[in-house]
Regions:
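Glycine- (often His-adjacent) and acidic-residue-rich active-site loop
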Residues: 12, 44-87, 103, 132-134
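Conserved CoA-thioester-binding segment of acyl-CoA-metabolizing enzymes
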Residues: 1-47
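Terminal peptide-recognition signature
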Residues: 5, 9, 23-24, 42, ...
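Phosphate-coordinating loops and pocket residues in cytosolic domains that bind phosphorylated ligands
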Residues: 15-18, 58, 67, 159, ...
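Crotonase-fold acyl-CoA enzyme core
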Residues: 86-182
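Conserved beta-strand positions that form and line the central face of beta-propeller blades
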Residues: 15, 55, 64, 144, ...
């Protein structure tokens, strides 16, 4: 059986906030504990009703980011995305990321830590925004990306913040397959 976990905030490019990461951790834990589940699909709902753009995840919601980091609805500063990366990376089941559109910043790092990535030929775009938002990936995303594409290319991706198409991501070994969106 397959568990599908999907971000569902398409109006903000499926950006995560503290509540989103808590929900993601809960869903991953449930999938891990369910002995009938063999594969986890990590994906996203969309497109955005505002502009029709598809997104997997744009990383941390900058509107939830305060001077001391990301602030939850309860006023506490936390984002726990590293816990989600760790859980995905060490899940005793296959975790396949299905990228229907933009995979940006922390969303890009999430696809990197998955066992496999399938990218929409028509809509998937990959980008790191660390330099743009002055929030560098101190977790698994940067290390695993370097293993996938090499040190120099990984630094280029993280430091320059360029957009990469699904085909470019495939060509450099970042995704396993480029598939039709439908």
């Amino acid at each position: 059986n397959v568990a599908r976990i999907a971000f569902n905030r398409p109006e903000v490019r499926n950006a995560f906030r503290p509540k989103t990461t808590s929900e993601l951790l809960d869903a991953l834990h449930d999938a891990q504990e369910d002995t009938s589940i063999g594969v986890v699909l990590l994906s996203a709902e969309g497109p955005s009703s505002k502009d029709g753009v598809w997104s997997f995840c744009s990383g941390g919601d900058q509107k939830a980011r305060g001077e001391k980091g990301y602030v939850g609805d309860d006023g506490y500063h936390r984002l726990n995305i590293l816990d989600a990366q760790r859980m995905i990376r060490f899940m005793p089941k296959a975790v396949i990321c299905v990228v229907p559109g933009w995979a940006v910043g922390g969303g890009h790092s999430l696809h990197v830590v998955c066992d496999m990535t399938l990218a929409s030929k028509e809509h998937a775009i990959f980008k790191q925004t660390d330099a743009d938002v002055t929030s560098f990936d101190g977790g698994y995303g940067s290390a695993y990306l370097a293993k996938m594409v090499g040190q120099k290319r990984a630094r280029e991706i993280f430091f320059l913040g360029r957009n990469y198409s699904a085909q470019e991501a495939f060509d450099m070994g970042m995704v396993n397959a480029v598939v039709p969106h439908d």
